[in-house]
Amino acid sequence: MFSDALMLLPKALGETVYMVAVSMIVASAIGIPLGVLLLATGKNQVLELGIANKTLSAIVNCVRSIPFIILMVAIIPFTRLIVGSSIGTTAAIVPLIIASIPLIARLVETSLREVPYGLIEAALSMGATPYQIIRRVLLPKAMPSIVAQLTTVI
């Protein structure tokens, strides 16, 4: 009996690694820019767009507050539309991605907030554009924290 369960372990481990890897890659590709956008459009930030920030923040907060099992059941039709099935390893990736995107976005936003505002002011005084501030000041300074936060999500 134990040997039968042991035989299933490599396949189950492979499926788990597949689900985690794909969902983290896709969720990070969407969540990191979303987190940057959440920070950049905030009050007293480089792109200050109050309505966009409040809307994005509300969506992120709403999705983060839904328990995963309820989210998984609620998006079964969407999962069927994307994958063609609502069961299986590949079908489980869709709700994992949807649940991970807001979490990653909020963690990235938090990491970016840790960058001292004096660095942003210095870049602004030297004539940097909002894109340059994000790419050359915020992201490099926050990268160690972002990587640490992403390992938490995994």
List each language-model region with its residue ranges.
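Loop-to-helix entry region at the N-terminal start of transmembrane alpha-helices
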Residues: 11, 15-19, 64, 68-103
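Membrane-embedded alpha-helices of multi-pass transport/permease systems
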Residues: 29-36, 90-94, 98-120, 147, ...
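Transmembrane alpha-helices
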Residues: 17, 21, 130-154
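Structural signal for alpha-helical transmembrane segments and their membrane-water exit/capping regions
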Residues: 1, 35-44, 79-81
